């Protein structure tokens, strides 16, 4: 999204470039504990446990590996990008520069003006045609030539959801990016947008029948599209809710429940760690700065639905819903023409760390559904091992663990941070400041799982989870460096009611003025200034001074002894 040089607004945050550069270096190591993480030598590993008897072999390790990727990436074929964002350049940033393993391209499902190389088309075309004629052939040609042959790339699209905001839709079919898959995207665009039927082949229009909507401005029309995906591609499609709170009043929790109830294998992810972080209003959340719009702010760069402890995401998890949080770049461009700023390149700032046996788009979708994922900004951490153990086994992110009432649950957290992140000074110089991200604390968050709310009852509108709380705050006093280079900590809790556990970590202390209060993130302020270059550097420093990660939950189902 293009951002013009901003005018002054309520609640501003003015920065000088040099001051923020210094502040960044302070904030990365500052906070409730101060200093760097435990820097002792690696401790000796514990003595190995006796080998299990042949009658009780250890459980097999989960198949797969950790991968890193982005589900929300635009190119020049979107109507609000810039000439610098050709397909080849975007893929080069994602894979060659920032080392991602997988990318879902997600250009707007609107009229498209350009081909994949940025050449202006003689006439506007539906993006589904641009995908079929330009984007997919180029992806296939690159991979056939050996370029990115070991990467997973596929074409999805960002849909303007009727009466809501944006959703990423992937229609993979049994053969992603095949002629059948591309035809399905074209049919979706015909049925569920206001595109003129004359823009589509007459034979297809005759076969598809009348368009699904009229004004494309009701929630019911969005539900029609979800139902269509479920009917036709129940196992090979998804709809991700993008930047859900960017504009006030776009979703109620009842509507989110309704979509997930209808198609739980399709509507299962929220883009809580939003892209467009280079905008003056972080994430492009630029509604009026008034108290009524506090739910439409970001909090440490995270959407209110996810950032609010005991809020919407926790309310959904408290029902046992498998709805996951993700982090995406929403890349259009970083800066353009020295005037505008938008977001970071794929893999530069926002990352999804996803575990799975990922070889292609279908296995990627399966891994996303499984939910063994943590999302992070600014490479605060680059590895996380989060387990809850009972007498029945071990639960990991996205799974459910059985436990007996009253038994001790052993919760372990192991994490690692890289030697540096991608903070540049000056922005765009290619000169990295060699700032090592430092975790100040990690919150272990727990909430009770009380069962599904039913349509037509007051509970279906419940957008809070009163039982959700921080049960343990880990600091450098709690963790130790282990033999594998991870900082490790543990905590024991008694199994009571059905519960879930999740993690949230930051480089900030618990009470940093303007940033956190009692460990909770505060709403992000607008960053502005009349000098464009200084403003770009201030925005960049703001983002790298305020880093968070969020894990997906581990569910625990408790049975009576």
Model features per residue range: what roles?
Residues 40, 44, 52-66, 70, ...:
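C-terminal functional module detector
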Residues 129-131, 173-192, 256-277, 345-362:
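Acidic, His- and aromatic-enriched active-site or binding-groove loops in soluble protein domains
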Residues 78, 200-343, 438-462:
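Domain-core and long-helix interface of multi-subunit machines
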Residues 2-18:
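Bacterial N-terminal signal peptides that target proteins for export
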Residues 117-126, 169-171, 254-257, 284-289, ...:
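Short secondary-structure boundary/capping segments
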Residues 35-36, 109, 174-182, 272-283, ...:
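Short, solvent-exposed beta-strand-terminating loops
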Residues 3, 20, 24-57:
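Bacterial Sec-dependent N-terminal signal peptides
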Residues 54-251, 307-308, 328, 513, ...:
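A metal-dependent hydrolase metal-coordination microenvironment
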């Amino acid at each position: 999204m293009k951002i013009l040089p901003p005018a002054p607004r309520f609640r501003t945050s003015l920065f000088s470039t040099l001051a923020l550069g210094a502040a960044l270096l302070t904030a990365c190591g500052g906070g409730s504990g101060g200093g760097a993480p435990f820097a002792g030598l690696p401790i000796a590993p514990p003595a190995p446990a006796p080998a299990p008897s042949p009658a009780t072999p250890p459980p097999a390790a989960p198949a797969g590996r950790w991968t890193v990727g982005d589900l929300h990436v635009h190119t020049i074929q979107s109507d609000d990008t810039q000439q610098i964002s050709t397909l080849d350049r975007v893929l080069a940033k994602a894979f060659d520069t920032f080392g991602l393993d997988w990318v879902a391209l997600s250009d707007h499902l609107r009229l498209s003006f350009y081909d994949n190389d940025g050449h202006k088309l003689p006439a506007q075309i539906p993006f589904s045609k641009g995908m079929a004629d330009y984007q997919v052939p180029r992806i296939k040609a690159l991979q056939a030539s050996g370029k990115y042959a070991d990467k997973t790339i596929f074409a999805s699209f960002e849909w303007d959801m009727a009466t809501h905001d944006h959703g990423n839709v992937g229609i993979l079919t049994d053969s992603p990016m095949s002629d059948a898959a591309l035809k399905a995207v074209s049919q979706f665009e015909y049925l569920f947008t206001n595109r003129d039927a004359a823009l589509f082949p007459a034979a297809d229009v005759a076969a598809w029948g009348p368009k699904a909507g009229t004004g494309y401005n009701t929630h019911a029309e969005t539900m029609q599209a979800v139902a269509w995906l479920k009917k036709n591609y129940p196992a090979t499609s998804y709809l991700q809710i993008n930047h859900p709170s960017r504009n006030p009043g776009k979703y109620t929790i009842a509507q989110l429940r309704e979509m997930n109830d209808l198609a739980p294998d399709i509507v299962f992810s929220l883009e809580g760690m939003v892209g467009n972080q280079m905008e003056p209003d972080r994430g492009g959340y630029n509604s009026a700065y008034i108290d009524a719009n506090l739910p439409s702010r970001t909090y440490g760069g995270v959407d209110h639905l996810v950032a609010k402890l005991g809020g919407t995401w926790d309310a959904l998890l408290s029902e046992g819903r498998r709805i996951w949080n993700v982090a995406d770049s929403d890349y259009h461009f970083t800066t353009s023409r020295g005037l505008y700023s938008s977001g970071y390149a794929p893999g530069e700032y926002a990352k999804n760390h996803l575990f799975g046996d990922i070889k292609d788009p279908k296995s990627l979708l399966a891994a996303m559904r499984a939910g063994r994922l943590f999302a992070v900004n600014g490479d605060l951490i680059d590895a996380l091992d989060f387990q809850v153990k009972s007498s029945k086994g071990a639960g990991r992110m996205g799974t459910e663990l059985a436990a007996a009432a009253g038994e001790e649950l052993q919760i372990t957290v192991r994490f690692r941070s890289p030697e540096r992140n991608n903070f540049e000074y000056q922005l765009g110089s290619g000169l990295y400041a060699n700032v090592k991200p430092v975790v100040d604390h990690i919150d272990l968050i727990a909430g009770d799982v009380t069962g599904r709310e039913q349509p037509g009852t007051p509970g279906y509108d419940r957008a809070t989870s009163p039982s959700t709380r921080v049960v343990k705050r880990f600091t450098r006093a709690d963790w130790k460096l282990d033999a594998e280079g991870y900082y490790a900590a543990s905590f024991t809790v008694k199994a009571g009611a059905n519960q879930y556990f999740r993690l949230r970590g930051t480089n900030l202390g618990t009470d940093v003025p303007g940033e956190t209060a009692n460990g909770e993130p505060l709403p992000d302020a607008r960053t502005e200034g009349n000098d464009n270059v200084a403003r770009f550097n201030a925005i960049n420093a703001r983002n790298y001074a305020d880093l968070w990660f969020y894990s997906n939950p581990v569910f625990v189902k408790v049975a009576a002894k």
